[in-house]
């Protein structure tokens, strides 16, 4: 797993460097304009406008190559052997790489200030674009790094044969909830659409799967329920799971009565008796799946399992839920970074574009 995480981080480093090349090219164009007297000699006899057009085209191609590559820089996938603290460590490392990207963007702004007047219109515009991008990257970095300690040395979806469930640690749940809520806010502030929860209940295609919620019991489930739990998780998307979690509140309590359509993912994660969890089929599947994902990823959390080795099916449901949630979070981060970098590039391109006479 460490080798896989290292490979992912290396790919992210390559992506960051490609983006910095793009931005450096933009600043480099500024320097070419400043040195008009020697421009033709420095460009092999071509006109300055020809050089600018060629460099601009290269910058555009490199930028979109970066955006294509960034789609492959994440992609941590949980297996039955993945430990909870490995997921937390991955998020922490990803946050560190966003911090490095922010530092590199700062160098772009400094370069523009050195090569031109610090208070000149081009340098000021580049500084503003970089600072805006850095603010979002810094926000994402902080919340991703806060997830470092949410797990422990148990496997994701931890369950044991014929054992009752255990609710996750409150501090871990609250930290995870706050981080996810803040990441979603940063995304929407950057122009990304917020995830939406669906209305699917625990009855799917005429099949009642309410017993699958018993994997979140704090007592023994009383029957093999792992497969029904997987059916619940499979009925919803990662986006719906994420939306159900961020709609929760820290103060949402464990179930002291029967679950219904208003029961949140946080309450499901904290659990209740098997009877309260499975009393009706009206709860939202996304909320149950969100509860399974939270309990599967956060320290101390344990899913309830029946005997006859049914813990394998229970853990499988936890792994599916965790992967769906992680994919949704990763997708949101990619979209956010993409929007932020595109906006920064647009502003920098506009700042270095030749001005018509009278607009200098």
From Swiss-Prot:
Subcellular location, record wording: Cell outer membrane
Keywords: Cell outer membrane, Lipoprotein, Membrane, Palmitate, Plasmid, Signal
Signal peptide limits: 1-26
Paired cysteines (S-S): none
Gene Ontology terms: cellular component: cell outer membrane
Lipidation feature positions (N-palmitoyl cysteine): 27
InterPro entries according to UniProt: Borrelia_lipo (IPR000680)
S-diacylglycerol cysteine: lipidated positions: 27
Bilayer topology: Lipid-anchor
More info: Genes for both Vlp and Vsp families are on (usually) unnamed linear plasmids in B.hermsii HS1.
Family in the record: Belongs to the variable large protein (Vlp) family. Alpha subfamily.
Purpose of the protein: The Vlp and Vsp proteins are antigenically distinct proteins, only one vlp or vsp gene is transcriptionally active at any one time. Switching between these genes is a mechanism of host immune response evasion.
The name this protein goes by in its record: Variable large protein 18
Gene: vlp18
